[in-house]
Structures are given as C-alpha cells and as structure tokens.
C-alpha cells in the first residue's frame, strides 16, 4: 500500500515497483489509507508524513494498535527529529524526498524480507530461548514475559533474536545494521537507537536502566547476564 498525496510521486513509485513485481494499492489521504488498510491485506505500507485529513504519524499510531506490518515512511522532512518521531511511532525505516527509486526498492525488499523471516515457520524442533522473565519461541515467532505475550515489530523481533542467539557477543552498530537490515551501514545511528529504545520499552522492567540488552558506551550492545 502507498499512502501519498502527491500524484506525481505516487505514479512514479507505482511505475517502478510494478516493474519489480509488486502490486500497489493507492491512498491519497490518511483517512482513505486507514479505510483501505482495514479492508485489505498488505505486505508493506509506504507512508508519507504530510497527508491531508489524517497525517502520517497519526495513521501509524492507529495501525500499530493492531498490526506489525512493515512501514516505510517517506517524507520531504529530513531532520533527525522527524526521523526519530516516525521511527518512535513504530515505522521500520525512513527515506527522505527526493529519493532514488533504486534505494527505495532496496529498502522495500529488505523490509518485506525481514517481515517474512519474522513470520516464517521453520520445520525444526521447537526452540525456546529463556532469559530471566523472557521466553523467546524462535519457531512460533513469539515472545512471552512472565507468561504474557509481547507484540514486537519485525525489526524488534530480529534485534531480540540477534542478541538472544549470541549471548556472549558484543555487537557494534555496524554489525547490528548489517545483520538486521542486511545493508551497508552508513553511520545512521539514529535508526538503531530508536528501534533499540522501542524494544527496551517492551521487554525491560525499567527501560532507563536496561537489564536484557546492555549498552557498552563507545562500543555497542550485548545481552545482559542474569
């Protein structure tokens, strides 16, 4: 789904992604986007921030109440504050206008690939990683804390699995980005910081003093020890 009020951009994105094999459903304002989202089933949402009737941030908050669908925000705003807001509300990635269609396509494919890995069932013996109050069920793609399910986005799930599967390893931000986003790292620390903060808000008792994922200042992150 593409939610974009600029018809020229919408047509350009549609033309390019259709050639790449994607089917596109268009919405030209936030309210139409919500209506279409509730009526259909989609692999990803491309979402502009500045929309009529309902802006992109409010759109994102509404769909995040019930869905973990990958969301890639596209906007003319390129400030760190706007990027942090979008990611903070639950976007998986962010790209600023004007953007390269090659880069946009790569980000779309990467987001869908992460979501597919998140939802795929593996024909293996059920593997559950237990860390203090967390039970991370790899095959059923679920996380429980004290027996209660946690709702993670695909990116948050990939981050948690990365640390849980490598309990002794210290990860630099470059290593995290390459592992989770499967792309070259261009020193965009903000995107990792925001996703890490959102994950901690869900798994930690006190996100300001994290125990599950520790920060090693100037180095990176590692799984906490209990």
Curated annotation (Swiss-Prot):
GO terms for molecular function: phosphorelay response regulator activity; transcription cis-regulatory region binding. CDD domains: REC_OmpR, trans_reg_C. It is found in: Cytoplasm. The keyword Membrane does not apply. GO terms for cellular component: cytosol; protein-DNA complex. Residues 1-112 form the Response regulatory domain. Its main location: cytoplasm. This is Uncharacterized transcriptional regulatory protein YcbL. It comes from Bacillus subtilis (strain 168).
